[in-house]
């Protein structure tokens, strides 16, 4: 598997890393297409560093990416599936990766993916990743869906490739267009409504009010439970995604990892003209304090992300900006 990288102005080292990522991505796509025929990729095999259950494909993907990057310019490899940073060599780059995002969807044939982030290597392994998201030199994902696609930014817009399985090449497509200013879709797990903080409930209440509410139009809700799939949809047609912190034990800071998931997605979305925050402040200017730190996450069309932040500025007794106290499923 190879990827078309002509005219992107990449250094030889970065281009080589992208070729290695694409090669493994293509291999994983083929493996997923045969799930259940030879191996149950959704079989539980343990628990990762963050306390989440691991599927067989989580471990397979992590091992494959780590092995492929050995001997490359990647000195430090940080994986959501590993407790600590793995040192691969003495190169000039550091790569953070969620090898298999959305693994709970493997056995139901829903799109899953790989998320990656590339930094210049720092003096120590952890320092290479505990830094501002604005310091990323590349970030992207591979989505394993009806098509296998790779989306990446090198800080100059967002590029898009689709895997030509017959030729074994990720073909470059038209670049991702800027996100629209307006949107009529939002993504959130509404079953957790009772646990959300008031500002999030207020924002969703006003969207649910539709044409009769302060937004003056109807909205559709989406929820795939696969961050890569949610991101791809938003990049293709707009929208806003919310995974807030809530009052459940272990969910106070949400469930998504800053280093492995939120920072790279925030980099992509920002390069597409959108916004990304923890509900109040930009993700890209937040400093994670540990490798597996979690953060609330809101991203998508810039206006909607800013609107969520504005709801957090309302007086504490307010639960809706214009319509007073109202529940999600009440008029």
UniProtKB/Swiss-Prot annotation:
Substrate binds at residues 101-104, 189. It holds the Pfam family FBPase_C. GO terms for biological process: fructose 1,6-bisphosphate metabolic process; fructose 6-phosphate metabolic process; fructose metabolic process; gluconeogenesis; reductive pentose-phosphate cycle; sucrose biosynthetic process. Mg(2+) 1 binds at residues 80, 98, 100. Its EC number is 3.1.3.11. GO terms for cellular component: cytosol. Homotetramer. Belongs to the FBPase class 1 family. This is Fructose-1,6-bisphosphatase class 1 2.
């Amino acid at each position: 598997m190879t990827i078309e990288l002509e005219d992107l102005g990449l250094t030889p080292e970065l281009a080589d890393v992208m070729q290695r990522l694409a090669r493994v991505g293509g291999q994983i796509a083929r493996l997923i297409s045969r799930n259940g025929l030879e191996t149950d990729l959704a079989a539980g095999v343990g628990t990762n560093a963050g306390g989440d259950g691991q599927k067989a494909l989580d471990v397979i993907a992590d091992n494959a990416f780590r092995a492929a990057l050995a001997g490359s310019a990647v000195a430090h490899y940080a994986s959501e599936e590993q407790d600590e940073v793995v040192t691969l060599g003495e190169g000039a780059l550091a790569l953070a990766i969620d090898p298999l995002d959305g693994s709970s969807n493997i056995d139901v044939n829903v799109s899953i993916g790989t998320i990656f982030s590339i930094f210049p290597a720092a003096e120590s392994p952890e320092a290479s990743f505990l830094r501002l998201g604005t310091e990323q030199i590349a970030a992207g994902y591979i989505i394993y869906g009806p098509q296998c696609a790779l989306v990446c930014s090198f800080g100059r817009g967002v590029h898009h490739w689709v895997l030509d399985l017959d030729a074994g090449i990720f073909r470059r497509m038209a670049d991702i267009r800027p996100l629209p200013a307006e949107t009529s879709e939002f993504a959130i797990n509404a079953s957790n409504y009772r646990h959300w903080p008031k500002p999030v409930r207020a924002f969703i209440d006003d969207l649910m009010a539709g044409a009769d509410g302060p937004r003056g139009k109807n909205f559709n809700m989406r929820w795939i439970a696969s961050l890569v799939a949610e991101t791809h949809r938003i990049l293709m047609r707009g929208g806003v995604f919310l995974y807030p912190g809530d009052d459940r034990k272990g969910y106070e800071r949400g469930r998504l990892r800053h280093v492995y998931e939120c920072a790279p997605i925030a980099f992509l979305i920002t390069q597409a003209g959108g916004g990304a925050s923890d509900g109040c402040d930009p993700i890209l200017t937040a400093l994670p304090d540990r490798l597996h730190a979690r953060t609330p996450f809101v991203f998508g069309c810039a206006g909607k992300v800013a609107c969520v932040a504005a709801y957090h500025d309302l007086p504490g007794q307010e639960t809706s900006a214009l319509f007073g106290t109202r529940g999600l499923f009440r008029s």
